[in-house]
């Protein structure tokens, strides 16, 4: 009789302690949420706040020679929730106040006129070239944002489209590059007009 009571008690204890034991060994973690509240009339998509653009693994032969580049890869900044106040100025913008945006890129550049961003990787004489939305015109990295070079936005969602590719450092006469990694960084800042 004592054996049956002990067995029943042991089974009851095991049954009631199993969920606690299982929950303790299931794992846990921390979730950190971050965001920034900005003044601009548009929000920047969370996926575009800190982008990583993969330009691929490119043969050195593809880059060696004047005017040679890697294939271009799209770089898109998504603006969401754009909403503009009515423009009541002397020459009002029918789309509203601050409904134009210009992008300024900040960083270390090897050639601002040709849109070339310096690489800190191990590949020698290679830069990342940033192109306008047409895919051929280099972004002038020295340009100051102004209404003249700003893009007209609409209410709702908008895309700011650019292209990136690898290029040899220097101008059209630069012809050689070395193998290795390419790492380039630029920060973008939006200016509304």
Name every feature range the model reports, one short phrase each:
Residues 2-6, 15-16, 20-193:
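Mature extracellular/passenger domains of Gram-negative fimbrial/pilin and adhesin proteins
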